[in-house]
Amino acid sequence: MSQRAAPHDESERDALDPYGAATHAVFNQPTELVDFNLFSGDAALQDGVAREGTGWASNELAALGARLGSAETLELGSLANRNPPELDTHDRYGNRVDLVRYHPSYHQLMRLAVEQGLHASPWTEPRPGAHVARAARYYMQAQVEAGHGCPITMTFAATPSLAKEPDLARHWLPKIHARVYDPRNIPAAEKQGLTIGMAMTEKQGGSDVRANTTRAIALGRDAMGEAYELVGHKFFVSAPMCDAFLTLAQAPGGLTCFLAPRWRPDGTKNPIQIVRLKRKMGNVSNASSETEWRGALAWRVGPEGRGVATILEMVAATRFDCMIGSSAGMRMAAAQALDHCRQRKAFGALLIDQPAMRAVLADLALEAEASLALTLRVARALDNRAAEPREDAFARIAAPLGKYWICKRTPAHAYEAMECLGGSGAMEDSPMPRLYREAPINAIWEGSGNVQCLDVLRAISRAPQAFDAYFAEIDSARGANRALDAHVAALKDDMRDLGDFEERARDLCDRLALALQASVMVRNAPAASADAFCAARLEGRGARNWGALPKGLDLAEIVKRALPR
């Protein structure tokens, strides 16, 4: 019989196996990334907040970053997705209730977001840098969990549209703006705080909302405004427990915007009936539903026939939040990969110190930082657009470009970060699978890639000042990087004739977005990061994988800057 090798000494034996049954000691396994500060541990975010005029919020952001990075808060994000919402169409007596039940963790995250003003702060506390401060808060909160951000975004985005109707604004905006989260399933008049949803797309149209068939029948004026009855359906209604929905329907004068409450003012249920909840690959904590509108009360927002124009500001705001959310996903994915590799050894050295892995980590960090930098630059444009026409023009083209590019870069980024963790990254008790499933969502929601590219074309053709503002922004970095200068020169040459823009839309928008990111990086990021970004993205190296970087870059400095703790 073979004999088990004896321990070297008694102390080793006791430490390894005090009961005589252990098979091995656990070592070379990273600790979980928890109890870290999402603001103080993010140099790119700190620099961006200071650069874009929001240094006044730094202390508040640091306090929030510590709270959001705690093990307790991070666990809420996991719980909200492991316990998806459930629908009760009827109660046990057969009464129609259309009630969606959420896990308590979802409500805790919603409450935290509302208390931080993510749903309203630039409207209720306008000041220089208000949009940048909100973007920074949202960016950190979305790293914890993405799904609850949907109703927060829609509530935030509703204000510009509702403000156009004084009667509706007077009745609804005070509670929409309140920093009180009230999830009770009761009429709006009985609540202290309200959330607002969107209900636009239908089965036959999708993004082509002008093809909507839901009908609006005028009822006359009441205390809220011009009342209508809506009959039809909506195929994608997220956060169906919101207190009211901005929606589109065909009125006698054409496609029109309406506000439809979930409860009527008399306390009866408005017949917006939930058919079922969608089974989504990602964004699981956030209920998305199919609904039928069986004579639902709604009030007109804006003139008949101007529905798309009326709701456009809301759509623009939701698209900007897609930029924030995707940037946040990239940051958390990169942070997970970096933190794992700084602790894990293979073949005699830490992964983070091995050249091939360091190149991958640096590339992931560059993408995350450039996405955040562009997002915060657009936030500054939103802050300044009322006072500076050029900033307004810049936002018109930069927002759809950013939404298109950043959101489309996120899925591949999430996968590569997952691979850095090896097999552990594919396990469901890791945050990586959730980040991976979440990654494609923002690229699809609020207008997919081609829709964003066509919006860029419209901005260029209908508002030439937007094109001028874009290149004025790019040209402010002229002379600072040869690769960027060459890229911009070729881009300008190719855009002299826009006759075939639609056919070349993806190519041109890719290059426009890269030029914008590179310009922001060259002007603001550390030289190591800016030079590496331009060398990797603009020097025409062709198809590549993450980490296929050119020689001569300071990768160690890039990685060091991106470490979360």
What are the residue ranges of the model-derived segments?
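Flexible, small-/acidic-enriched active-site or ligand-binding loops
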Residues: 268-294
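A short core secondary-structure module
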Residues: 225-271
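Internal helix-loop-helix
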Residues: 95-187, 237-239, 438, 445, ...
